[in-house]
């Protein structure tokens, strides 16, 4: 409650200039030059403005939808390699949003929903592809980890919390959320594996697949606007998930063996098999590209769930050369990001070619793919980023192979053009 009488006319009863209610009939009366407005009229004005904005918002749909070629070009700016996956994703995403813009069935033909399944090793770019597409289309995007999801009634995260997160990303604007993209990672971890005694999830993950089924296919999810139990009497928001694009991703370790068994590819499985080298890695990628729905069923996904993910794209494992490109070529490449950080201190950061190769080699040996690059670069530059704000006159820092291998610190170049190797001494 505000103090309504301290408006310069302490003995006079004040009224809202819009609705005529007195200061005693409203919670707050705001004074202006010879005019007063109550909190109820302010709220009414806000409602009117919100409604007008909502009426204008659908007109955005008339904006030109990027073609598959344009989507692919945008992906090329941020993601290295994975050409086949980019093409599959670009077409699927284009068709999805074309379907939303032409929701009225033509000649009785109703377009089905094309959710996407991405199969590829850790650090190959699955999450980045989904995130980059959402950014290029300017639609809300959220991520979920399938391993944290449970059926209703189990301890864990309810599948409808995914929609809650999407709503949060667009300030609970339902219309915006219904044009969004949801990426569910580690989807292979909820596969049904009855032959694995270590599985402790409910019904070996099948229950979670069943819970996700309706959400992915399309249902009207009732979501509390502020997150559930804290406000039990609030009205629920109704979100139509049939308009949301779901992209599921997973490494699917061992899936190539399932495919080989079906296709009778004699690549050598068992104790007598040869140790896999670079050639075998290419063979694994080629084998995964031949995946069929029946292989995914045998792997542990239920047929109904696979049916809701009709578009399948496989990603190849990144080699050392690709990791070097990832470090320097994309618009938001790691080296460019750290260079921007150093520029804020007035320092130029240079990564020499041998340093990039050494970083890529280290990431390959850790088997983390592109995902492990940031932690490696962060470790290399930690001491330098700690010291530089306190050192006067540094204009350039140089990172070479010896720095990556821990044999020396980055070379610091000062204004007087003396090149000094930063010693570890205090």
UniProtKB/Swiss-Prot annotation:
List of residues binding Zn(2+): 16, 19, 38, 41
GO process annotations (BP): cell division; proteolysis involved in protein catabolic process
Gene Ontology molecular function: any one: unfolded protein binding
Binding-site residues, ATP: 121-128
Pfam families found in the cross-reference section: AAA_2, ClpB_D2-small, zf-C4_ClpX
ClpX-type ZB domain location: 4-57
Alphabetical keyword list: ATP-binding, Chaperone, Metal-binding, Nucleotide-binding, Zinc
SUPFAM superfamilies: Glucocorticoid receptor-like (DNA-binding domain), P-loop containing nucleoside triphosphate hydrolases
Superkingdom field: Bacteria
InterPro entries, per the entry: AAA+_ATPase, ATP-dep_Clp_protease_ClpX, ATPase_AAA_core, Clp_ATPase_C, Clp_protease_ATP-bd_su_ClpX, ClpX_bact, P-loop_NTPase, Znf_CppX_C4
An annotated GO cellular component: HslUV protease complex
Subunit and partners: Component of the ClpX-ClpP complex. Forms a hexameric ring that, in the presence of ATP, binds to fourteen ClpP subunits assembled into a disk-like structure with a central cavity, resembling the structure of eukaryotic proteasomes.
Family per similarity comment: Belongs to the ClpX chaperone family.
Protein role: ATP-dependent specificity component of the Clp protease. It directs the protease to specific substrates. Can perform chaperone functions in the absence of ClpP.
Protein name: ATP-dependent Clp protease ATP-binding subunit ClpX
Organism of derivation: Shewanella sp. (strain MR-4)
